[in-house]
């Protein structure tokens, strides 16, 4: 997994979005890696708690607009459905999930944090849904 790292210690899995140069923006590769990471922690009976966080100065600064811009309607819908599937998976996970928000949690990042059972935010954390101002 290139964009998501999983570390496990003392029955805790830490899932880290690792694309700090892009403020951990969500694209297909990140979603794919995140699905693999969720498969791993859900199946591991030694993991009791899952913490989701972001590397660098952002939790997740939303979707990767550069990847989304050229998408046609069908591609955009598929991307949205993939994101929604992941959000529902985190929301319905039997293991407790904690969002450790260390910076920007915008758009899909805010949604992912809200999908977790508990949110812990640093003083530098910023939550928002900037896309509501579009259109």
Where are these predicted regions, by residue range?
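Glycine- (often His-adjacent) and acidic-residue-rich active-site loop
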Residues: 35, 46, 54-89, 105
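Hydrophobic/aromatic residues within transmembrane alpha-helices
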Residues: 15, 52, 64, 112-113
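Conserved CoA-thioester-binding segment of acyl-CoA-metabolizing enzymes
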Residues: 1-55, 88
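CoA-thioester-processing core
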Residues: 86-94, 100, 106-135
């Amino acid at each position: 997994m290139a964009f998501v790292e999983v570390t496990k210690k003392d029955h805790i899995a830490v899932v880290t979005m690792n694309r700090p140069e892009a403020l951990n923006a969500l694209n297909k590769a990140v979603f794919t890696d995140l699905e693999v990471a969720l498969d791993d922690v859900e199946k591991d009976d030694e993991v009791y708690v899952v913490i989701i966080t972001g590397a660098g100065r952002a939790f997740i600064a939303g979707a990767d607009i550069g990847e989304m811009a050229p998408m046609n309607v069908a591609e955009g819908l598929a991307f949205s459905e993939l994101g929604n599937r992941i959000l529902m998976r985190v929301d319905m996970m039997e293991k407790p999930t904690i969002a450790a928000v260390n910076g920007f949690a915008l758009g899909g990042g805010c949604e992912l944090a809200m999908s977790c059972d508990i949110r812990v935010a640093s003083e530098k954390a910023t939550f928002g849904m900037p896309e509501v101002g579009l259109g």
